[in-house]
């Protein structure tokens, strides 16, 4: 996972509240067995509307999504985060997030910043005035900025640290690799242990 300290790019206004994970990515796409290639499934039902932002050239390559309250609610599916990232989003700002979605985002390298509803309206107004507006989401300073506009956001310290360091669950575990190895070597031989993968298993 790549470290994130700052995200700068085109911002998209998603003027919807209560956007659940099924609206982010419908269930039929969950059968895929890879963690990439979900950009075509993002907001699949809504993108059938030619006026939806995904179909607007001005928002091509967008990296920041500004949504209404209660974004990412509903069932737990990491695919929702994968779809947003595969499309190109690196940060989402909203007054409230589904707890599980927010947790999944921090583990997958998607910055989720909590802003007030008034500040969301300010951001939307700026984006309406200048479609394709570039927005900078600064994780170090915890502020989103555009010319003449500065909006603070909240993010818990643990998730902020993981994003700044670029630590997914595997990388977080590997920070303690020496301690884990020492513990394994000190266990009795008859106890269950983690063994290196055999070459044949790696080939499969």
From Swiss-Prot:
Gene Ontology CC terms, in alphabetical order: 3-isopropylmalate dehydratase complex
EC class (word) = lyase
Catalytic reactions of this protein: (2R,3S)-3-isopropylmalate = (2S)-2-isopropylmalate
EC code(s) of this entry? 4.2.1.33
Q: What CDD domains has UniProt attached to this entry?
A: IPMI_Swivel (cd01577)
Q: Which UniProt keywords apply?
A: Amino-acid biosynthesis, Branched-chain amino acid biosynthesis, Leucine biosynthesis, Lyase
Q: Which domain of life is it from?
A: Bacteria
**GO molecular function of the protein, one example?**
3-isopropylmalate dehydratase activity
User: InterPro entries attached here?
Assistant: 3-IsopropMal_deHydase_ssu, Aconitase/3IPM_dehydase_swvl, AconitaseA/IPMdHydase_ssu_swvl, IPMI_Swivel, LeuD
Pathway in which this enzyme or protein is active: Amino-acid biosynthesis; L-leucine biosynthesis; L-leucine from 3-methyl-2-oxobutanoate: step 2/4
User: Where does the sequence pass through the membrane?
Assistant: none
SUPFAM superfamilies reported for this sequence: LeuD/IlvD-like
Q: Which Pfam families match?
A: Aconitase_C
According to the record's subunit comment, the protein's assembly and interactions are:
Heterodimer of LeuC and LeuD.
What the entry lists under NCBIfam families is as follows: leuD (TIGR00171), PRK01641.1 (NF002458)
According to its UniProt entry, what is the function of this protein?
A: Catalyzes the isomerization between 2-isopropylmalate and 3-isopropylmalate, via the formation of 2-isopropylmaleate.
Give the family from UniProt.
Answer: Belongs to the LeuD family. LeuD type 1 subfamily.
Name this protein carries in UniProt: 3-isopropylmalate dehydratase small subunit
Gene symbol here is leuD
């Amino acid at each position: 996972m790549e470290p994130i300290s700052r995200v700068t790019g085109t911002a998209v206004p998603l003027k919807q509240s209560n956007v659940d994970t099924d609206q982010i990515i419908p269930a039929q796409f969950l059968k895929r067995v890879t963690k990439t290639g979900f950009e075509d499934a993002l907001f699949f039902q809504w993108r059938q509307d030619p006026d939806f932002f995904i179909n607007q050239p001005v928002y091509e390559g967008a990296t920041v999504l500004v949504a209404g309250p209660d974004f990412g609610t509903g069932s737990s599916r990491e695919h929702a985060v994968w779809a947003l990232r595969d499309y190109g989003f690196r940060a989402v700002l909203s007054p409230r997030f589904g707890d599980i979605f927010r947790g999944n985002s921090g583990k997958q390298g998607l910055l989720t910043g909590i802003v007030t509803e008034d500040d969301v309206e300010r951001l939307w107004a700026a984006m309406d005035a200048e479609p394709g507006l570039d927005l900078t989401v600064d994780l170090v300073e915890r502020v989103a900025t555009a010319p003449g506009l500065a909006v603070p956001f909240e993010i818990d310290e643990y998730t902020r640290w993981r994003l700044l360091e670029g630590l997914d669950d595997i990388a977080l575990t590997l920070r303690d690799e020496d301690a884990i190895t020492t513990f394994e070597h000190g266990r009795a031989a008859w106890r269950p242990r983690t063994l290196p993968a055999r070459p044949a298993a790696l080939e499969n």
